[in-house]
Structure formats: structure tokens, C-alpha cells
Amino acid sequence: MKIQSLGHVVIKVRNIEKSIEFYNGLLGLPVVAHNEKPPMAFFSLGNHHDFAVMEVGDGAASPTVKQVGLAHVAFKIGDDLDDLRDAKSHLDNASVPCAPVDHEVTKSLYFADPDGNQVELYVDASDAWREEPQRVAQSGPLAI
């Protein structure tokens, strides 16, 4: 067996409509399908679906840093720091606090969705990882 690629990610949310508004309305992910039981929305970036949200109800606990499970979902938004600046401005205008991070091979913004799930928007910044794979583990502050 050989895994060929990552197919999609599904995250659990409290309210499907709030999540659709966030991922489609704010971030611009195109909705391609819905499911009623369990309530789900599927988003596509060119495949049948790349990302989905599944409603688990208002009583669900928020994710925490010390909890086993998904740490964050990352979406590439371009190859230029100006793309990241535009994204930061967009998030700032929507009153979504974000943390800029320099990973050397990428420049990133980290923030939370309405349920506390962590999201990363990033731009590629360097191909250094091709020669030195360990470079993907770099992390520091980013001033943008």
C-alpha cells in the first residue's frame, strides 16, 4: 500500500450555518454539497471535496491545546507576502484576531473558527526544504 495524497479533512462544529458563514462567507471556500444526517457541508478547491464540517451540536466542548486530535487546518492562499497582507487585512476587517508566524518555508496567519478550531492561511516563501527537509520545522514571529 502507498498513500498517494491527502484527500480531505472533516472537522466537527457546533453550528453548521455559522461554520458555512465562516468558511464560505469569510474565507471564500466554495460549498459543493450538503448532508442532512449528520448535518454536514462539503467545500471544494478543485477536487470532489477537500474540506468538510460536521455539526455535533451546541453542547460540544471546545478543542484545547492539551487535547489529542487535530491541531489546525492549513489553506494555501498564494506565493507572495502581499497575499498574506491582504488576508490579514480581510481578517482584521472582520474582527478575527490572527497571529502572523514565520516558518521560513511559509509565512502564515493563525486564527480560530467560531468553534475554536485552529486555521492557518499561508503563502509559500522558500524551497529550502527541498534540500534540507528539517527547515519545515522553523517557527518565529512575523511582522506584516
Task: Please place each PLM-identified region on the residue numbering.
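Vicinal oxygen chelate
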Residues: 13-17, 73-118, 123-129, 142-144
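Short, flexible turn/loop "capping" segments at secondary-structure junctions
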Residues: 1-3, 65-68
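Short beta-strand/turn micro-motifs at beta-sheet edges
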Residues: 58-64
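Core segments of cupin and vicinal oxygen chelate
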Residues: 12-56
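Short, solvent-exposed beta-strand edge segments and adjacent coil->beta transition regions
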Residues: 6-8, 68-72
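Amphipathic alpha-helical "stalk" segments
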Residues: 39-41, 48, 122-144
